[in-house]
Amino acid sequence: MQDVKTYLSTAPVLATLWFGFLAGLLIEINRFFPDALVLPL
């Protein structure tokens, strides 16, 4: 179990989880507010 915790705390795994979370969050925001990501010019 300690090896699994050590593996999950490494930088590539944390970066993958973080970017996956951010991508999902942006997709959900874009789904509910489709024009929010477009800069108003």
From Swiss-Prot:
Its main location: plastid. Keywords: Chloroplast, Membrane, Photosynthesis, Photosystem I, Plastid, Thylakoid, Transmembrane, Transmembrane helix. It is found in: Plastid, Chloroplast thylakoid membrane. The chain crosses the membrane at residues 7-27. It is a single-pass membrane protein. InterPro entries: PSI_PsaJ, PSI_PsaJ_sf. GO terms for biological process: photosynthesis. Belongs to the PsaJ family. This is Photosystem I reaction center subunit IX. It comes from Physcomitrium patens (Spreading-leaved earth moss).
